[in-house]
């Protein structure tokens, strides 16, 4: 199973905002046994977003998660781009509109805003691609969307980290299933990653594992993450590498 992630926002490209969403989504997908093959960041432009969505769909991922650009402002255009990419029209989601209305009325009652009126900017967030299943935003206003398209499960989530994390946990992860999978972290006692590389390559050829290495500066250790379908396979891979003269400490 493989997945791709698209994050949307000019602020991500200018460096004004750290793209923590992509790291969080990738970690959650990896924990579910998905191989995240690509993370793409794109600005707030309809055609640019449409283009990267189509590029991703051409690679036929099992899951595509898009985050950002669902708010009420002029540059929140992700739903428009998704609809264009899929050849669908945007339609009003009445349930979403009611939830948005209730959200702003609650903020008004709490004294956080001075006007709960559903103006055009707020109504805009209730439009989803035709046929999409709305995803409830339990901590914010903008709903997300779930669309199955030619074998790919597409999820469109808000860009605000708190909203994205809640929707990911409550609406996305229950829909994507998981694959049995184990990951273990080790510190390899070797100072030169180039000397470790051929041993890792040989290990991957022999055992059904994926291995990521992460040098810890020019110190004594190199961080290793090993992924496999069961812990026994990881143990065998580690023992093999130990037989090549590499010592390991579990954990980082």
Curated annotation (Swiss-Prot):
Similarity remark: Belongs to the CinA family.
The protein's name: Protein PF0476
Domain of life, source organism: Archaea
Cysteines joined through disulfide linkages: none
InterPro entries on file: CinA, CinA_Arc, MoaB/Mog-like_dom_sf, MoaB/Mog_dom
CDD domains: cinA
Pfam families: MoCF_biosynth
């Amino acid at each position: 199973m493989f997945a791709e992630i698209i994050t949307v926002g000019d602020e991500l490209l200018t460096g004004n905002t750290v793209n923590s969403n992509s790291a969080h989504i990738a970690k959650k997908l990896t924990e579910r046994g998905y191989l995240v093959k690509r993370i793409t960041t794109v600005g707030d432009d309809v055609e640019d977003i449409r283009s990267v969505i189509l590029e991703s769909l051409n690679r036929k991922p099992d899951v595509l998660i898009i985050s950002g650009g669902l708010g009420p402002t002029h540059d929140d255009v992700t739903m428009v781009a998704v609809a264009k990419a899929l050849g669908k029209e945007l339609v009003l989601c009445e349930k979403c509109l009611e939830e948005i209305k209730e959200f702003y009325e609650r903020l008004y009652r709490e004294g956080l805003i001075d006007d709960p009126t559903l103006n055009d900017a707020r109504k805009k967030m209730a439009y989803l691609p035709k046929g999409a299943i709305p995803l409830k935003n339990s901590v914010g206003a903008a709903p997300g969307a779930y669309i199955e398209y030619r074998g790919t499960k597409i999820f469109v989530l808000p860009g605000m980290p708190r909203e994205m994390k809640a929707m990911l946990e409550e609406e996305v992860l229950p829909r994507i299933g998981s694959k049995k999978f184990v990951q273990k972290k080790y510190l390899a006692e070797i100072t030169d990653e180039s000397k470790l590389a051929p041993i890792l390559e040989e290990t991957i050829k022999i055992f059904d594992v994926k291995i990521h290495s992460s040098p810890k500066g020019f110190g004594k250790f190199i961080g290793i993450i090993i992924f496999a379908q069961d812990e026994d396979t990881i143990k065998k891979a580690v023992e093999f590498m130990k037989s090549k003269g590499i010592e390991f400490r579990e954990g980082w």
